[in-house]
From Swiss-Prot:
Species the sequence originates in: Halalkalibacterium halodurans (strain ATCC BAA-125 / DSM 18197 / FERM 7344 / JCM 9153 / C-125) (Bacillus halodurans)
One GO BP annotation of this record: glutamine catabolic process
Family, similarity comment: Belongs to the glutaminase family.
An example Gene Ontology molecular-function term: glutaminase activity
The protein's assembly and partners: Homotetramer.
Gene encoding the protein: glsA1
Xref: HAMAP family: Glutaminase
Lineage: Bacteria, Bacillati, Bacillota, Bacilli, Bacillales
Name assigned to this protein: Glutaminase 1
Length: 308
């Protein structure tokens, strides 16, 4: 794709000015410490073919990007029918933490797995008798996807999110009242906040993107580690719901499957080609990485990545 890393480095430098226009997620105290000037990217093509630029070695927590991985694991654990009996498939124009549609929809279930209510319901379906067992299975799945067995969660971020998870608590109790979840709410929130606090760098995340981009195949062996139908479900939700209530605009301007998190990370993929990870913690008003989106838009236009 690029003959030299310097080409990608130059594009990153051109987009770095946009970091000044965003703000970090201050409502989660541990995330408020992030350096707003950070911008890094990794593009993984399989095997040893990887290009990185900028601050690609900086670690970040997955936050809402973890919803993609948890959904894949839940689909493997309980199957498509069970998952979508509790969670819908439709996009929403509401913010990711909104409760309004839950109150008016019949039956009262979350519209999709990418909003917080839907993600809580999905995490509830990951098999495990305890939080530790479910989290261990999720981490093992991530280790298989990344080939990095050292990945774990950031305890400080997890505790910070657990202590301030007032809205997610209310969402969870609402879901429990309507039979969408069965778990103890505090145990579910413990699992969910640790899931969101799983920490890695751009290279790890880009490798995960490669697996989903290439129909669930391991980049080293070519063996399918995620079933084809699961990889397709994941890619579809990334297109329709992956960028919160800016998913439509992102589809038009960038045109590739992507999932963002309030840490400032974005997982993106070019189907049948690349896995891409971008990190820049300065967010726009909808909770997406401002410079990260600008970087992906620039690259997509330059390389004609759009699937539309």
């Amino acid at each position: 794709m690029w003959k030299q890393d310097e080409t990608l480095e130059q594009i990153v430098l051109e987009c770095k000015k946009y970091t000044e226009e965003g703000t970090v997620a201050s409502y989660i105290p541990a995330l408020a410490k992030a350096d707003v000037s950070t911008l890094g990217i990794a593009i993984y093509r399989g095997g040893d073919e990887q290009v990185i630029a900028g601050d690609a070695d900086e670690k970040f927590t997955l936050q809402s990007i973890s919803k993609v991985i948890a959904l894949a694991l839940a689909l493997l654990d309980v199957g498509e029918e069970a998952v979508f009996s509790k969670v819908g498939m439709e996009p929403t124009g509401d913010p990711f933490n909104s409760i309004s549609k839950l109150e008016t929809s019949v039956p009262s279930k979350p519209l999709n797995p990418m909003i917080n209510a839907g993600a809580l319901a999905v995490t509830n379906m990951i098999i495990g008798e305890t939080t530790e067992q479910s989290l261990g299975r999720l981490l093992s799945f991530i280790h298989e996807l990344t080939k990095n067995p050292t990945i774990t969660y950031n305890l400080e971020v997890a505790q910070s999110e657990f202590d301030t998870a007032f809205l997610n608590r209310s969402l969870s109790y609402f879901l429990k009242q309507h039979g969408v979840i069965q778990a103890d709410v505090e145990q579910l929130l413990d699992l969910y906040t640790k899931q969101c606090a799983i920490e890695m760098c751009c290279s790890d995340l880009a490798r995960i993107g490669y697996v989903f981009a290439n129909e669930g195949r391991d980049p080293d062996t070519g063996q399918r580690i995620v079933p084809l139908h699961v990889a397709r479900i994941i890619k579809t939700f990334m297109v329709t719901c992956g960028m919160y209530n800016a998913s439509g605009e992102f589809a038009i301007r960038v045109g590739i499957p992507a999932k963002s998190g309030v840490s400032g990370a974005i997982l993106a993929l070019v189907p049948n080609k690349y896995g891409i990870a971008v990190y820049s913690p300065a967010l726009d008003e909808k909770g997406n990485s401002l410079a990260g989106i600008k970087l992906l838009e620039t690259l997509s236009c330059r390389e004609e990545w759009s699937i539309f």
